[in-house]
Curated annotation (Swiss-Prot):
One of its GO terms (biological process) is tRNA methylation. The keyword Cytoplasm applies. This is tRNA uridine 5-carboxymethylaminomethyl modification enzyme MnmG. Belongs to the MnmG family. FAD binds at residues 15-20, 127, 182, 373. GO terms for molecular function: flavin adenine dinucleotide binding. NAD-binding protein involved in the addition of a carboxymethylaminomethyl (cmnm) group at the wobble position (U34) of certain tRNAs, forming tRNA-cmnm(5)s(2)U34.
Length: 633
């Protein structure tokens, strides 16, 4: 069947949440003609749940998005009300930035960026159907029967896909924050042959700031020391007038209220059918699962400068409204709090991610990509990271250029995508530092060193960003070389100076770099002995130098592991392989291989239920086939 289109585009993005805006901006900046279609323009880049960006692992993802040329980091740096570096007392691998956002300003600023982007058309429109011919995407059809042609379509519908909001016994069709649900498109994706799952997430009630007794809570201020998500942001623009958050706790009375009303909780009454997030459970789930805990932390997070709404982080719930009010009033500082919005659960459809390639293109339909919560993840940052990769690959496909696959050793975004397409997910997927085996080389401070050259290669990093990156890289390389050459000798004058600083004297000559490997020696101390750099170094360059030098041994071990895995990743598996023709592999492995259809030996080795013996048999089989082909040739 051929279609007559009202308008033609290179790439169409369906849904303008955090995944959709990154996908559409990336494709447009790479030179494609892009349509971004969304149900409600007022929901563009909206934060329906927590009013924050970043956090453990997630903050590193935002830095990665920025390093590649994405928008989230720049946008939050313009609109935050508080900034805080987490895990500063721990090693560099787990440090991550978190910002409290001005929720309305964040969405408004991102909307303006999208509206001003060259090559990008923004349209309020509900897409009801993905149009396909011969297993290839050709466009979309809207609810108003407009047909738009495209060579690639990226679906980023989030929790709107057959969304249903649940509060107590009440259940109704809705996307997040009472927006319209996308039901017809959900039916269409299933009709196209995609396997669909059903997940659930939730959000806490919001209370009025002026009704909170802050004297009964603990203040949580932001950092005075400048930190930014974007590598383009400047320290002189760092916000000093930050708004604090506040800490309080549930108590025994709170827990009794929940336990006495579990029969009315949708999670336990059978109303909620979708699988909820393990790492962000509802308060009723926490009380049941952790019955031995006598209290749980709650953070009171302002939603912006020009609003009275305060987000009660840690109190996600779908309990009936009257129970939510009673629960809030049992909490210290909230005894007289006015509830502005009730918490709710939302169930929604997802595309089971084992059906995707590492580019986020579906295996079933050429040119159809999915990203964000549509793929079963949770969180704005995870969504934005996927949206960026999907948008880049949609543009590359249209342009006939090689695809971009971020490896596990490249980025947390690569870890997430590999987890999704290789292992799938049975619950809303959240990124954690523990998921990354190479986390010491996937740090907050080196995201640009890892990814900006990749962003430049695909055409997403502009000249301004590239020049800033080159200056930093050149400074780092020159100073590392100098520190590797400059020597300290165990002479009397040097040792007296070292001892005066309270450190152990030298017994042998060593380079300044070797001297800095001592835990107590920082860059400033080392330069007291070898002199300063020939140029003023940026503080971020110094931070990077200290980390790379002090952890060099561990970093080199990680790089050795990366090299070994690279050899596995380079061993491709033919797309048309007959898994039934391979003798001796375990039944479970055969079933998993058929379901996931891994593209490389490396990916095959990471599938759960596949053991090393199965991989060895697979490699022998592939080598035998290669030899047979060589003889024929």
């Amino acid at each position: 069947m051929s279609y007559e289109f009202d308008e033609n585009f290179d790439v169409i993005v369906v849904g303008a949440g955090h995944a959709g805006v990154e996908a559409s901006l990336a494709a447009a900046r790479m030179g494609c003609k892009v349509l971004l279609a969304t149900i409600n323009l007022e929901m563009l880049a909206f934060m329906p749940c927590n009013p924050s960006i970043g956090g453990s692992a997630k903050g590193i993802v935002v830095r990665e998005i920025d390093a590649l040329g994405g928008e989230m980091g720049k946008n939050i740096d313009k609109t935050y009300i508080q900034m805080k570096m987490l895990n500063t007392g721990k090693g560099p691998a787990v440090r991550a930035l978190r910002a409290q956002a001005d929720k309305a300003l964040y969405a408004m600023t991102m909307k303006h960026t999208v509206e001003c982007q060259e090559n990008l058309t923004l349209r309020q429109s509900m897409v009801d159907e993905i149009l396909v011919e011969d297993s290839k995407v050709v466009g979309v059809r809207t609810a108003t029967n407009q047909k738009y042609g495209a060579k690639a379509v990226v679906v980023t519908t989030g929790t709107a896909l057959r969304g249903e909001i649940i509060i107590g016994d009440l259940k109704y069709s809705s996307g997040p924050n009472n927006s319209l649900a996308s039901v017809t498109l959900a039916d269409n994706l299933k009709e196209l042959g995609l396997e669909i799952g059903r997940f659930k997430t939730g959000t806490p009630p919001r209370v009025k700031a002026s009704s909170i007794n802050y004297e009964e809570t603990e203040i949580q201020p932001g950092d005075e020391k400048p930190n930014h998500f974007s590598f383009l942001s400047k320290d002189e623009d760092y916000l000093q007038d930050q708004i604090p958050c506040w800490l309080t706790y549930t108590n025994q009375e709170s827990h009794d209220i929940i336990n006495n009303n579990l029969h009315r909780a949708p999670m336990f009454s059978g109303i909620v059918k979708g699988v909820g997030p393990r790492y962000c459970p509802s308060i009723e789930d926490k009380i049941v699962r952790f019955a031995d805990k006598n209290r749980h932390q709650l953070f009171l997070e302002p939603e912006g400068r020009e609003t009275e709404e305060v987000y009660v982080q840690g109190l996600s719930t779908s309990l009936p409204e009257d129970v939510q009010k009673e629960l809030i009033h049992s909490i210290k500082g909230l005894e007289k709090a006015e509830m502005i919005r009730t918490g709710y659960a939302i169930e929604y459809d997802i595309v089971l991610p084992h059906q995707l390639r590492a580019t986020l293109e579906t295996k079933l339909i050429s040119g159809l990509f999915t990203a964000g919560q549509t793929n079963g993840t949770s969180g704005y940052e995870e969504a934005a990271g996927q949206g960026l990769v999907a948008g880049i690959n949609a543009a590359l496909k249209v342009q006939g250029k090689p695809e971009l696959i971020l490896k596990r050793s490249d980025a947390y975004i690569g870890v997430m995508i590999d987890d999704l397409v290789t292992k799938g997910t049975l619950e809303p997927y959240r990124l954690l530092t523990s998921r990354a085996e190479y986390r010491l080389i996937l740090r907050h401070d080196n995201a640009d060193m890892r990814l900006t050259p990749i962003g430049r290669e695909v055409g997403l990093v502009d000249d301004e960003r590239w020049n800033i990156f080159k200056i930093k890289k050149n400074q780092f390389d020159r100073e590392l070389t100098r520190l590797s050459k400059e020597k300290l000798k165990p002479i009397k004058e040097t040792n007296e100076k070292i001892q005066a600083l309270g450190f152990k004297p030298l017994t042998d000559a060593m380079t300044a770099k070797e001297f800095m490997r001592r835990p107590e020696i920082d860059y400033a101390t080392a330069t007291q002995f070898v002199g300063p750099a020939a140029e003023d170094l940026d503080a971020k360059v110094i931070e990077l130098l200290e980390t790379e030098i002090k952890y060099e041994g561990y970093i080199n071990k990680a790089l050795d592991q990366v090299a070994k895995m690279k050899r596995m990743e380079e061993k491709k598996i033919p797309e048309n392989i007959d898994w039934d023709a391979i003798d001796s592999i375990a039944t479970e492995a055969r079933q998993k291989f058929k379901k996931i259809n891994p593209e490389t030996i490396g990916q095959a080795s990471r599938i759960s239920g596949v053991n090393p013996a199965d991989i060895s048999i697979l490699m022998v089989y592939l080598e035998g086939n290669n030899k047979a082909r060589r003889k024929v040739d």
